[in-house]
């Protein structure tokens, strides 16, 4: 329909809106030179934050990219740090059954878990935990939690996850420390791609590194935590644009 409007109604404003974060696995979301040349794209594409503007032009510098409101992340933008958190470690599972199983397996191999510490699991709404692993096969110190992810993240110290999931990125800006078992080679590039502060996450290539990272963040020095949270807040404004009446008007 972009081709039709731009060919037969060239004076009509056509806009696109990409209201999500980015992953290297989704390179197909970056418009190409051919799409630009043949006018199958909107005249202007809006992203949800300043950090995405250059990324979106990876395959075509001629694109007209602007920043619009981060509608989906409105609550995250207004979030203020909550000191009291009741969950030490939460595993965030996604729609990939194999990846989710590996996240659970990696956790069970850590000394921290073997000592009997509680670990909470938040499964994806479309893939119940029962579809990944039978309840009787789960160690007793795994506890499933349900509810809005934002409320869980606000009460969590460490999030462990992998694969394509906006929840992992959101966790950073709810001031959780994020641990990423290296189950996908793209994992180590996604956060670099978005320029996420290095202090807020660790890539763990084995259970020993995962164990050490858990202990590091649970015993994080106050000064280090303060610096980490400050950097998160500074970067959040580049990742997610505030919703205002002015930027909502782009849709009118």
Task: Report the location of each language-model feature.
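Conserved catalytic-core segment of nucleotide-activated headgroup transferases in glycan assembly
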Residues: 66-135
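Short, charged/polar "capping" segments at the starts of alpha-helices
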Residues: 1, 23-26, 52-57, 75-77, ...
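Acidic donor-binding loop of glycosyltransferase active sites
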Residues: 154-162
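Structural alpha-helical scaffold elements that stabilize or flank donor/cofactor-binding regions
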Residues: 37-38, 151-153
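C-terminal alpha-helical cap of glycosyltransferases
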Residues: 222, 236-252
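Active-site and donor-binding regions of nucleotide-sugar-utilizing enzymes
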Residues: 1-71, 166-168
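Catalytic binding pocket for nucleotide-activated donors in carbohydrate/polymer assembly enzymes
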Residues: 42, 59-67, 134-140, 163-238
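Structural motif
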Residues: 44, 88, 157-158
